[in-house]
Amino acid sequence: MRKFLLPFIILFTTIVIILRLFFLQVFYHDENTSGIDNIAIETVYDYPERGYIYDRNGELLVSNQPAYDVMVIPSEVKNLDTLELCSLLELSKADFTDKLQKAKDYSRKKPSVIVHQLSNTDYAVLQEKMRKFEGFYIQKRMLRSYLTHNAGNVLGYISEVNEWELKKNPYYLAGELIGRSGVEKQYEEFLRGKKGVQYFQKDKHNAAIERYKNGALDTLPIMGQPLQLTIDIGLQAYGELLMQHKHGGIVAIEPKTGEILALVSAPSFDPSLLVGRDRSKNYTALYNDSIGKPLYDRTLLAQYPPGSPFKVVNALIGLQEGVITPQSVFSCGGGYRYGGHIMRCHCGRGSNDLLYGIALSCNAYFANTYKRAIDMKTSSEVGMEKWTAHVKSFGLGNFLGSDLPTGTPGKVPDINLYNKQYGKGRWNGTSNISNAIGQGEILTTPIQLANVMAAIANKGYYYTPHIVKKIDNKVTPFKEYTEPKHTTIDPKHFDPIIRGMNMAYLAGTARRTQIDGINIAAKTGTAENFIRVNGKRMQLTDPSIFVALAPVEDPKIAIAVFVENGYYGARVAGPIASLMIEKYLKGEVYRCDFERQMLEKSLEHEYLKPYLGQKFYINQ
């Protein structure tokens, strides 16, 4: 019996080892499996090109360019000549040691980046020499190549995945790139494509010797899907040019579709600054600009009092609730008086009907309208509840649900706010009368106010604003961008509002913005402007606000312009909006002197005033 036992044990052990090796090499070849890494298989990724990005007219905005990273797999590093490698990579020994330790901390068996984005010259020099350093290799990747210097806030940028993203999403490995902002982030899963994979058999010295299974399991990379945006890059670039040396935002929307034609945040930034080895340095410079804040997308994030443009929303609510008609007349006499206070007005007329109230932006008219809407119901709470619901139906006070980064919701006051502020039953329409003229507690973002104009252009409905028109040459399949959202206002009430806005353009507060051959409905605006600097509250020059739709007969563009510290609406925002409309509808700007005034207009001195430690004046 004993003479058979030893051979049996040897045979059994051999069979177990063979079966184990067979299992590991054939069935358990996932790249995240340490067993394969230890024994026989090397996984090499072939990175795809990201999808190209085009504007609405088919102009290519973003393509790709090759870049090369020096990678390390710590478990494969052997017999390392640190000084020679540091010399080749132009790294100090301390810097190299730190990078290598971080790679080990991440994973001893997965690749990590040691040097990002070699130049083509450095790559040519290092390509052959890297073979002598076991565990190190050069990985080709695709970086973005921007064919435009505009729309940085729209396009966004890509950067290396961070530790949190590596833990959250197993698709990514250290050193890989991901959309970080803008369209690059929002449409990452469409743009990134699919990595190709190659498996190599390794010998006992850990060197790749042949394709595993003759490449039967290998896959080719699949390029990301192309995107066609809704923006007109010519209009976008023109808007950024007009907003040079100014802070604020321009949003232009096609009312019939909700497609965003331009999304200008100023100051803007060149997206190509965030590509290449200087990306980190350039990002830091942009981030540290505490006054201009070019990385802060004002079109989506900045919450401003809408000022007088909000009067048209109050007028629509008044018409819907039956508290006014287009023929309703209110006296002005220099302002609206309430409880020993006066809300001043500069319309210059003793009394106004609705159309003149809009055209001349009469504060008294809209204060009376607002008070009636709030107080003529069974209680002010009921009136306020209805008012809040009407305002929110225009997309205000909430996220619009666009395909852009989330942004901010703005603010629409409600009964809970005033019950908390004044006490239940202890307030009425005059307690918050500033809401009548777009100040008080109400706040909007530029994209929200442009969307209000789109809803007015459509006489009661809007499409959710969106930035992508086609994915992979097919119309976007998202129903939320093709189904209209209706306001609570009956369509019949929009005609007098549009006529009043047209009067503002022809003979009222917006008359300076007239364009030959284009009939516009417009509304100017401004609001008081307070900020805190080092804990001290101070008042600055008012913002310049302007909204419009054009042409009146068949609106093709709805626009909102905010210019911080620009003073009154017709001073800066109005001219900029009219130039944008002219550019879009005519394809060219013919008012060259008017254009030159806006191009040369700088408000940098206004933005520095609160930080110079000197006495200053406002609204000059």
What are the functions of these language-model segments?
Residues 601-602:
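Cytosolic-side transmembrane-helix boundaries in multi-pass membrane proteins
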